[in-house]
Amino acid sequence: MKTTIYDVAKAAGVSITTVSRVINNTGRISDKTRQKVMNVMNEMAYTPNVHAAALTGKRTNMIALVAPDISNPFYGELAKSIEERADELGFQMLICSTDYDPKKETKYFSVLKQKKVDGIIFATGIESHDSMSALEEIASEQIPIAMISQDKPLLPMDIVVIDDVRGGYEAAKHLLSLGHTNIACIIGDGSTTGEKNRIKGFRQAMEEAGVPIDESLIIQTRFSLESGKEEAGKLLDRNAPTAIFAFNDVLACAAIQAARIRGIKVPDDLSIIGFDNTILAEMAAPPLTTVAQPIKEMGAERHRTAGRSNRGKRKAKQKIVLPPELVVRHSTSPLNT
């Protein structure tokens, strides 16, 4: 049978209230008694029931990360950064991967509201009406919420993003500096603020250089290797550009694979630049030039804002914008004339 709080209290020779105070770190308890109870809990492999804590309105010491695709190294590395910091602060972390599915997103929001987690971090676009409504309900419950890598100005949450406009601008400027003007963009569905801002920065750099943009070279696809490879292949078969700006490293690697299948050499025949600077960028062949997002800093900033919010020192929403950085490797080179 599973060990209960009653079993722990009996074995430690204390009241159930005392065990509860040790678990929740509340009330006045001597160090000797606290250590005795903790030793018994360890010996009996007792795990506090977080669901019961949620029902009584107590802290569950759990936070949740809602991400669109945890198999994408960007979100995997982001989750690792947040989890490490959460562990230092005494929190456990739940990870909800929505697979870009609004129905899954809404379902997770409902579950997290019921569990009364102590905070929720969103790394999804939250575009559907149902998701927005569910999120507004969570906000009304006074659950601390924050958003990373996305921006929803009308929602009452802390936001940690990078300067996506600058990132798109730097990517285009790099390719232009190498002599490329026939540049394609491989994006997602274009609905998120991050995508919109990256294309805004890209357009700004092209306009400053006096280079017209071929709208047929702005390709939409799902943020997956398979979809990216398919759409990049169609692009290369139809009207091969001399350079591609992919909106994440997964799509950039997909473009490299599509080029290799067609005997197009990267970077001799085709320059490719990605976005994120995940482990994929280093492992790609050739190693990928990319715009780096400061993933660790994004996770750390999220916890700093959450700490201020949970301590009641700040009620106003805070937006933190971090700078991107161009990382030049071997997937881009001067235009081969």
Curated annotation (Swiss-Prot):
- Does the entry feature the keyword Transcription regulation, yes or no? yes
Q: Where is the HTH lacI-type domain?
A: 1-57
- Mind telling me which InterPro entries this protein's record contains? HTH_LacI (IPR000843), LacI/GalR-like_sensor (IPR046335), Lambda_DNA-bd_dom_sf (IPR010982), Peripla_BP_I (IPR028082)
Q: Where is this region: Disordered?
A: 300-319
Q: Name one GO biological process term.
A: regulation of DNA-templated transcription
Q: Recite the UniProt keywords alphabetically.
A: Activator, DNA-binding, Repressor, Transcription, Transcription regulation
List all membrane-crossing ranges: none
GO molecular function terms noted in the UniProt entry: DNA-binding transcription factor activity; transcription cis-regulatory region binding
* Cited CDD domains: HTH_LacI, PBP1_DegA_Like
Q: Describe the function of this protein.
A: Involved in the control of degradation of B.subtilis amidophosphoribosyltransferase (purF). Probably activates the gene for a degradative protease.
Query: What is the protein's given name?
Result: HTH-type transcriptional regulator DegA
Origin organism is Bacillus subtilis (strain 168)
